[in-house]
């Protein structure tokens, strides 16, 4: 199928990006999903610093590539081997899909899946290869197996988390990275326990969710630190939100 997407073809554009326009909106061709893949109509896509790191070249990825890994959408087509999803399901995307078979997955560390990391670094899905082509038939890479800065995207079953339809999809998109990364850093990496004292440095999207993750974990004292003048509204959110 054909749709539009934000394609990055070169890195190192000058800032501000609003003027240099490093992304081009192009018509792309999506191949049908494989047996363990789904086709999703994109509802929301956040701009994460990881996207900016690909644009400025500090996070090397094969080019060209369709960016976007923090998003949400509605499933419109399901691969033949998938039995636990249905068309019309609302979903949030996770950029850390797991194969369930590699050493890291078997050790209980699916978020560090070796297969997903290897294929993602090559701009491919876990089933191998890309499902994206440009108007001339040339291959375009996937970003973290997601590429949600587009009207539609094909991704692995492991990248899909079904959410209740009562949750607005535009809001749910943030769970795909900012919420998962911030709360996960506190709960899974730092392993904060009830009564612990926690300091969070920086109150962007990830930091705010780190604070909320610390509260969820039962931290006895939470210290939020940010020197940016624009952070005052974030402090208000933490006080009264």
PLM region descriptions:
Residues 1-6:
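Short structural boundary motif marking the start of a folded domain
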Residues 8-14, 45:
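Short polar catalytic/cofactor-binding loops
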Residues 18, 29-31, 62-68, 140-145, ...:
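Short Gly/Pro-enriched turn/cap motifs at secondary-structure boundaries
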Residues 19-25, 56, 143:
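Short gly/ser/thr-rich secondary-structure transition/capping motifs
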Residues 29-45, 55-106, 111, 119, ...:
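Glycine-rich beta-strand-centered segment in the early N-terminal region that forms part
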Residues 95-158:
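Cysteine-cluster motifs in flexible loop/terminal segments that predominantly coordinate metals
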Residues 151-152, 158-241:
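Mid-domain Rossmann-like dinucleotide-binding core that forms the NAD(H)/NADP(H) cofactor-binding site
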């Amino acid at each position: 199928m054909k749709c539009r997407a934000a394609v990055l073809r070169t890195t190192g554009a000058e800032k501000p990006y609003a003027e240099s326009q490093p992304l081009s909106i192009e018509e792309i061709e999506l191949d049908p999903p494989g047996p363990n893949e789904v086709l999703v109509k994109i509802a929301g896509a956040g701009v994460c610093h990881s996207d900016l790191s690909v644009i400025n070249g500090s996070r090397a990825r094969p080019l060209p590539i369709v960016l976007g890994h923090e998003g949400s959408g509605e499933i419109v087509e399901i691969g033949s081997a998938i039995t636990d999803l249905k068309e019309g399901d609302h979903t949030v995307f996770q950029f850390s899909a797991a194969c369930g078979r590699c050493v890291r997955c078997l050790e209980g560390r699916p978020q560090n899946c070796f297969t997903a990391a290897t294929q993602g670094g090559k701009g491919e899905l876990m089933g191998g290869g890309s499902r994206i082509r440009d108007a001339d038939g040339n291959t375009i890479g996937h970003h973290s197996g997601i590429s949600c800065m587009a009207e539609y995207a094909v991704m692995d079953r492991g990248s899909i988390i079904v959410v209740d339809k009562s949750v607005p999809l535009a809001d749910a998109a943030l769970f795909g990275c900012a919420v998962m990364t911030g709360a996960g850093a506190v709960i899974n990496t730092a392993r904060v326990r009830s009564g612990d004292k926690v300091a969070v440095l920086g109150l962007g999207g990830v930091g705010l969710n780190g604070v909320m993750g610390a509260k969820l974990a039962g931290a006895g004292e939470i210290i939020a630190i940010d020197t940016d003048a624009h952070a005052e509204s974030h402090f208000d959110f933490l006080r009264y939100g």
